[in-house]
């Protein structure tokens, strides 16, 4: 379960999230909608660890992740597919997948890794066909698929899109 308690955050000196409380149960899908500047991206970036909240907490399965660096939050089980295209132009699709793959570690018994580079390219066959291509050579849609694949390879419990 993802739990946000009293989350307050903002950007450019302004606050857009004011004491937000939210619980997201396992196996559910939620959407956040609102006008420009309402705080949708700030919310996602705060949960993913890209922005530190000014107050409140983010917990994943009861474990505090507030204020941790994004790579630790990803390891804790929160994956992010960025809004814009986020691929490294000089890396091939294969290199992106290897870079993002996180095999299970000892103690990860509760997180079996069902997402492997082979499994991802099986589910997203267009990526499999382009494994040798550089990020700069991919179409916008292919870059977005690659961003999704990279997020899945962390075997996240929560996936932020």
Regions found by a protein language model. Give the residues of each.
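Conserved ABC ATPase signature
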Residues: 134-138, 142
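ABC-type ATPase nucleotide-binding domains, specifically the catalytic core motifs of the NBD
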Residues: 12, 68, 93-115, 125
